[in-house]
């Protein structure tokens, strides 16, 4: 009798163990392209657009939001493998979100391309309101030594690089990938506004007065919203000091995001796309403070048109990669 009871108990335990065997985990989403924006003004659709809205309206209207622990905003993915999220403004904020998303087992980034997108400023000698720029280099503006101009010889530099930052103070993006992005940008419709056209005429630079176009160059990443001709000149000198291309865009996140991605997957599939919504200095006769805090009616205009231009230009390379995925899966094909 005792033997029978023991056998029945063992069978019951075995049956219970079998019932508790976990079902196979859902396969992770294979990400082909991840689009990162830094902020949205209100909702993802139907109101004034920030950086994320043009992407959302193109790719994720029918997609459910997925919460990722540690990320600022949900991640959206469509059936084609195009995913994206709003990461937050500034290096730390955006990097924390990007790291959380990359480490989430629900997503497979092993063959993903990254489009880091947003708005920024441009020096009037290099760009204009409404321009869209693909980065050839990402440079960190903050890393190094600085001191007050009053403590220096007049006109001498007030920045000195510091040894030890060489591997993460600048990143050269893959020239072939950038070349494809530029090629597929040709012919993209570029919007403009009457307000932006009038505002450009305050500047003497031919480039500042030009119509919006697609350009390439160095994107300068700084948590400090640096402004004025002196700091613009310093940014240009840092780009030259590091062997990068001309500084054309100032922004707050891309170099930091590149480091986060590099430590997981390298930098060979990163694109940085920025639209210019302001100049990095005032017009002739305008102080830097006046330009930073303009009187009513004295703003640049063109914000809505610029974010539309970012989406129009960036979506071309995203769509091309997805449509020709067998060719792009293993890396950018030869130009």
Cite the ranges covered by each PLM segment:
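Accessory terminal and edge-of-domain segments that mediate assembly/interaction
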Residues: 20-335
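Bacterial Sec-dependent signal peptides at the C-terminal "C-region" and cleavage site
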Residues: 13-21
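Bacterial N-terminal signal peptides
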Residues: 5-14
């Amino acid at each position: 009798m005792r033997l029978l009871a023991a056998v029945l108990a063992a069978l019951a335990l075995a049956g219970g163990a079998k019932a508790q065997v976990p079902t196979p985990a859902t396969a992770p989403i294979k990400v082909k392209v991840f689009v990162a924006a830094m902020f949205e003004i209100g909702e993802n659709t139907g109101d004034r657009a920030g950086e994320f809205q043009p992407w959302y309206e193109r790719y994720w209207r029918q997609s459910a939001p997925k919460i990722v622990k540690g990320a600022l905003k949900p991640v959206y993915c469509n059936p084609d493998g195009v995913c994206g999220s709003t990461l937050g403004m500034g290096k730390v904020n955006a990097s924390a979100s990007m790291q959380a998303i990359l480490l989430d087992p629900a997503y497979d980034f092993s063959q993903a391309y990254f489009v880091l997108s947003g708005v920024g400023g441009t020096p009037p000698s290099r760009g204009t309101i409404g321009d869209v720029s693909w980065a050839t280099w990402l440079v960190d503006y903050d890393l190094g030594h600085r001191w007050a101009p009053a403590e220096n010889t007049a006109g001498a530099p007030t920045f000195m690089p510091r040894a030890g930052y060489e591997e993460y103070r600048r990143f050269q993006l893959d020239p072939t990938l950038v070349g494809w992005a530029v090629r597929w940008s040709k012919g993209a419709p570029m919007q403009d506004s009457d307000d932006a056209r009038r505002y450009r005429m305050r500047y003497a630079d031919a480039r500042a007065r030009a119509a919006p176009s697609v350009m390439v160059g160095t994107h300068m990443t700084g948590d400090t919203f640096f402004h004025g001709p002196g700091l613009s000149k310093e940014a240009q000198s840092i780009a030259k000091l590091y062997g990068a291309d001309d500084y054309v865009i100032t922004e707050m996140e891309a170099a930091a995001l590149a480091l986060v991605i590099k430590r997981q997957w390298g930098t060979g599939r990163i694109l940085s796309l920025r639209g210019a919504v302001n100049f990095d200095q005032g017009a002739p006769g305008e102080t830097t403070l006046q330009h930073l805090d303009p009187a009513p009616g004295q703003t640049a205009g063109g914000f809505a048109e610029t974010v539309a231009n970012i989406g129009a230009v960036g979506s071309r390379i995203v769509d091309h990669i997805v449509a020709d995925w067998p060719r792009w899966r293993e890396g950018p094909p030869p130009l």
